[in-house]
Regions:
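Sec-dependent N-terminal signal peptides
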Residues: 4-14
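Extracytoplasmic cell-surface/polysaccharide-interacting catalytic and binding patches
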Residues: 18-246
Length: 246
């Protein structure tokens, strides 16, 4: 089934179901949680994840260490305000080099999400590198994980073992995948994030993206939002899409 068809059926079925006052209150809390504005219960040391994801991550890092792979988390839970700061900093910087608003937005969403739409808001997703060898500068670059790069051994280990711990690569190198660029460092704890994505698709995305604090929000037209939903929020690995529909 095409993504657009799946989404149409999803929204139609959910729109036909009346919500009680309790369900509406729960939905409001759910919206805050999914958009990085809630107060999720997070655990972890130099990372923060929801409990079930954190336990699985600890188990995975221990298994990797036995194979001399030292996994280091460089980003995990990220709230709305943090994502807003990242977005606005990039938007302002791009303005100084002369990009038009549309060029600016397109450039930012090569790798960064619009605040309120990041999977990092859920406490299920984490960016990983290897603690050794040490790398100076920007460590989240795809070439560092490929061929003979410093994180190539980590990638090989994750390719072989990560799924067995529930972690799946989100933005894979697939020709048919659209949206965000390839990110060999970004993993999601599927047992929980699958459920969260299903919930997220029931939110009113336009009201989230129209936050006046988000620079450039006036260019988030209805057409853009639909495009962003289908190609970016749902521009994830084919495996994750299949799991979502089960």
């Amino acid at each position: 089934m095409k993504i657009t068809t799946f989404l149409s059926l999803f929204f139609l079925l959910n729109s036909l179901l009346p919500l009680s006052a309790q369900e509406q209150s729960s939905l409001s809390s759910q919206t805050l949680l999914l958009t990085g504005q809630g107060s999720p219960v997070l655990i972890g040391g130099q990372y923060k994840l929801v409990e079930e994801a954190a336990i699985a991550f600890e188990n995975m890092t221990q298994a990797a260490a036995q194979d001399s792979i030292i996994i280091l988390a460089v980003s995990s839970y990220r709230g709305f305000d943090r994502q807003l700061a990242i977005w606005n900093r990039k938007f302002t910087k791009n303005e100084t080099i002369g990009l038009t608003p549309y060029q600016n937005i397109k450039k930012i969403i090569e790798y960064s999400t619009i605040p309120g739409t990041s999977r990092h808001h859920w406490g299920t997703d984490i960016d990983l590198i290897s603690a050794e060898p040490k790398v100076e500068g920007d460590v989240l670059q795809a070439h560092l994980f490929e061929n003979e790069g410093p994180y190539a051994d980590l990638k090989k280990w994750m390719d072989k073992h990560a799924n067995s711990f529930g972690f799946h690569l989100v933005y894979t190198k697939e020709d048919k995948r659209k949206g965000f660029q390839y990110e060999p460092w970004h993993y999601s704890y599927l047992p929980t994030s699958k459920k969260y994505l299903e919930w997220y698709l029931n939110l009113e995305l336009e009201s989230i993206l129209k936050d006046e604090n988000i620079l450039g929000n006036e260019y988030f037209t209805e057409e853009f939002i639909q495009h962003y939903l289908e190609e970016y929020i749902l521009g994830i690995s084919a495996n994750l899409l299949v799991q979502m529909k089960k």
